[in-house]
Amino acid sequence: MQTSWQWHRRLLHNLATPEKSVLRLNLDETSIVLNHDGQKGVVTSSADNKVVLVNKKSKQRGTLTHVVLVCDDNEIQPLLPQMIIGNEHVLRVRDMNELAPDIPKNVFLVRAKSSWITVPLLIVLFEMLRKSLDAKNVTKHPVLLMDACPVHLHAHVWRAARRQRIYLCFVPASLTWLVQPLDVAIIRKLKAFVRAHYKRTQVQHATACVDLVHVVRILVRAIAKNSAGPDMEQCFRRLRLCCLWHWSQITDLVLLCKSWLSQHCRSR
């Protein structure tokens, strides 16, 4: 934790100048399930002619991966590239063609062998991020916060970040809940939005089977709501204060232990 925190502070101190400020970013991947049938309350019954869901579970299984990217500037947030990755056995070519008119310019729907993030896809995302910032003449220095998963730590990813003038900072796996805005404030709300609108689609279509195309459309709406929703700057600032508080508590505890050990050794 100490190394990560010092690294982050060093980057902010070295990059921030009167001419150029720092753009703090956070990237993380989250799994989006394609059905929510396992929860209570899906099947309903009624004596009148209202819409009723039948007791039939969806045969659709699998997940999509949403690569989420947020920053501490609400004006830049809608420009940031977002990626949705689907396994080629789940996300079919005809689904891609049907969804093409509904996908915003900053959202990239990817059909790949695996639904998880890979080094080549992350490099492409860095390239798209740089193009998005340059297209709007964003002069801030991007500092990207990521967890320490093997894909993020790959040498090719580091080189790609250097080419695109993106400064990387990593968070230990056990501390993402404390440091990353995505883990604390964003992803949970995004998944809740998808789950709620999945249920709403079931009611509207009078079926428990919601196809992949509808799930992707719901996710795209969730991404748009996320871009226009919470104050990202406040999220980053609150986490920074929280980290400072926790770090001060840890420092005080270490000093207290040292003092106790010193007194204990002298008494013996």
Predicted feature locations:
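Phosphate-facing sequence motifs and polybasic nucleic-acid/acidic-lipid-binding regions
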Residues: 1-266
